[in-house]
């Protein structure tokens, strides 16, 4: 699969860094939200795009992108969504509800192992430093708090928090929690009442969505939305399984490709670091 036009981000690195600075100063710093996920779009054109090319990309993701919750290829009728999402949005099996908020992001070096197979000498040190970083810790706490509120709304006994855990991917390592509870609600109501995840919007969610509209120049399309499988288990009980649509290429039939990548901004965010994070997230699907 080759690109006829390699394209680039709709907001360049310098301008995105300025947006990050503005949000930290004018919004988060003034109490308009605890954190905000602001995205930018990488646009390119795939040469001779077809259903066969879509299947090729899907196969490569299955082979190369380890740790995904869902690896998928979905055709809407007018565009292809092909991706490897690390994050479960929500699942329901036998009345058991699960959500997996993911936030902290550690970028793996290109060479994670030495020639003899031992870990790269700086990897352990850098990973431990990442795990002790207060900015990364608070970033995850904020989204867990917001999604736990959702769990309390849909689960009659409230929710349980398990973790934190590491979520290793091919290019990144994330930190995540597992939220668990029981519900009597219809699975369709569960899906509706958990939209949209704080991990792709911010918190509080309603205010974050208002700020996203203000700071992102275009609508998000399918980015941050949810795919879902709904059905029944062998006992006839309703089931739901839904990932968040991130790390996904949105490709039109003529080959126009869009990959949206966002960074979670908090008071202590470093603009240059957030710029690099969007490159790493987009790179997982573009490589």
List where the protein language model places each region.
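Flexible, glycine/charged-enriched surface loops at secondary-structure junctions
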Residues: 33-35, 141-144, 219-223, 287
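Non-catalytic accessory segments adjacent to catalytic cores
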Residues: 1-48, 52, 94, 136-138, ...
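Contiguous alpha-helical scaffold segments within structured protein domains
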Residues: 1-8, 45, 106, 110, ...
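Active-site-proximal structural scaffolding
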Residues: 16, 51-54, 83, 90, ...
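An anion-binding catalytic pocket shared by soluble metabolic enzymes
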Residues: 37-137, 153, 230-261
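Conserved hydrophobic core element of enzyme catalytic domains
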Residues: 178-287
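Short coil/turn segments at secondary-structure boundaries
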Residues: 34-40, 70-76, 189-190, 205-207, ...
């Amino acid at each position: 699969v080759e690109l006829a036009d390699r394209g680039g981000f709709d907001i360049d690195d310098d301008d995105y860094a300025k947006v990050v600075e503005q949000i930290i100063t004018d919004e988060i710093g003034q109490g308009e939200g605890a954190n905000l996920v602001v995205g930018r779009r990488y646009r390119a054109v795939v040469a001779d795009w077809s259903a066969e090319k879509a299947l090729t990309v899907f196969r490569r993701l299955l082979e190369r992108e380890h740790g995904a919750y869902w690896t998928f290829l979905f055709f809407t009728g007018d565009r292809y969504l092909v991706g490897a999402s690390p994050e479960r949005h929500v699942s329901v099996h036998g009345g058991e509800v699960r959500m997996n908020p993911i936030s902290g992001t550690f970028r793996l070096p290109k060479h994670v192992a030495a020639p003899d197979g031992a870990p790269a000498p700086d990897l352990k040190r850098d990973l431990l430093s990442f795990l002790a970083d207060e900015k990364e810790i608070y970033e995850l706490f904020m989204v867990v708090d917001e999604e736990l509120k959702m769990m309390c709304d849909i689960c009659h006994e409230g929710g349980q928090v398990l973790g934190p855990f590491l979520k290793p991917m091919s290019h990144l390592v994330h930190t995540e929690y597992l939220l668990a509870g029981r519900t009597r609600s219809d699975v369709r109501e569960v899906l509706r009442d958990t939209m949209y995840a704080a991990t792709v919007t911010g918190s509080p969610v309603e205010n974050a969505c208002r700020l996203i509209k203000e700071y992102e120049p275009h609508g998000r399309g399918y980015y941050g939305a949810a795919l879902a499988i709904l059905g029944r288990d062998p006992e006839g009980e309703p089931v739901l399984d839904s990932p968040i649509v991130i790390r996904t290429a949105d490709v039109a039939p003529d080959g126009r490709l869009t990959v949206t990548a966002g960074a979670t901004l908090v008071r202590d965010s470093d603009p240059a670091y957030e710029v690099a994070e969007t490159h790493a997230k987009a790179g997982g699907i573009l490589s």
